[in-house]
Amino acid sequence: RLENVIYIELLRRCSNNFFDIYYYKETPRSKEVDFVVCNQDRAVELIQVAYDIEAEKTFKRETNSLLSASATLRCDKLTLIAFTQTRNYEAGGKCIHIVSAIEWLLRPMDN
């Protein structure tokens, strides 16, 4: 699965930089975020992974989860990794960077 590939790469990138990786779920039947990258107990990036975001329902579910967690965790760096798309999406005064999995895997980690 795509989430597993991203997780393994996050482990590789974060192990040398003193970052921790968490899964986030607000309440039992609510929104979740696949990866919360933290540095010293502060969320520095929220990452959602979805193979296909072409369907409006899927796109809204993934972006709404990021926006909701962003407000709760006070984190503005929001990334949605999809299999093929790269673009920016703005909502609620926030910018979600949508990036293809290949592009994300090939770029260096920015601290």
Labelled PLM ranges:
Residues R1-N111:
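A cross-kingdom feature that marks ATP-driven nucleic-acid transaction machinery
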